[in-house]
A protein has these predicted regions:
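Catalytic cores of the polymerase beta-like nucleotidyltransferase superfamily
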Residues: 1-231
């Protein structure tokens, strides 16, 4: 479990975030009946941009949870399907669970409080594995952090410094080689929140794009899009 350069950040703030995320995870588990809670409790963790948001005194839009193994994933999906009230378009299922509404899609489960329209929790079941394995595929380094409720531990990918929690610069994770078009399309989302991206980071994405995408038309579309965005 990595805490590279943790002395460069506010340790008390990290402890405060751990305490907050412990409560978030407990609330999340309490949505489920005891049988499912028992199967989940040591097999899930939280990861992604919510940790960066909390460190920078912002309220996360939602909390993304991940599962460590396929057996736990199957148990969870089987249970949720038993709570389903409506199916739509094959992979989409809608249901209710302990005062919450949920929507299951091919890749994720979104859980929403019944009297709200904003997402509260997301379970990303497309990607399964340990925290280090999963966050290795995240797009930018400020997102490559996780919280393990089992250990009450906030850590980062083994290659990522805790200094990335403090910066407003987007730093591309060049370990990633999937959905690179999606990475580019998400750039305006980050820049609209006050983050910046330097030309060298755009260059890293384009170099990776060159190696991972074989369709020349797709590459051209991406380059045209970057041009229209002023990159």
């Amino acid at each position: 479990m990595n805490r590279k350069d943790i002395l460069h950040v506010d340790i008390e703030k990290i402890k405060s975030i751990e305490a907050h995320l412990k409560e978030v995870c407990e609330d999340f588990l309490n949505i489920f009946p005891d049988e499912i809670k028992e199967k989940l409790k040591d097999k899930f963790y939280l990861a992604g941009g919510c940790i960066y948001s909390l460190y920078n005194d912002k309220t996360p839009h939602d909390y993304d949870f991940f599962i460590q193994d396929n057996t736990t994933k199957v148990n969870l999906l089987t249970f949720l399907l038993s709570c389903t009230t409506k199916f739509k378009h094959g992979n989409i299922a809608i249901g209710k669970l302990n005062g919450f509404n949920f929507v299951k899609t091919k890749y994720a489960i979104t859980i929403i409080e019944s009297d709200h329209i904003v997402n509260k929790y997301q379970i990303i079941h497309k990607y399964i594995g340990s925290p280090n394995e999963v966050v290795e595929e995240f797009d930018f380094k400020h997102n490559m952090f996780y919280y393990s409720p089992k250990d009450n531990f906030l850590g980062s990918h083994e290659s990522v410094s805790f200094k990335y929690l403090k910066t407003n610069e987007l730093c591309f994770n060049d370990l990633r080689c999937r959905d690179l078009c999606g990475v580019i399309l998400r750039l305006p989302k980050f820049t609209s929140r006050g983050m910046i991206i330097k030309k060298k980071e755009i260059a890293k994405i384009l170099i990776k794009l060159q190696g991972c995408i074989n369709d020349e038309n797709e590459k051209e579309i991406v380059l045209d899009y970057l041009s229209t965005q002023g990159y």
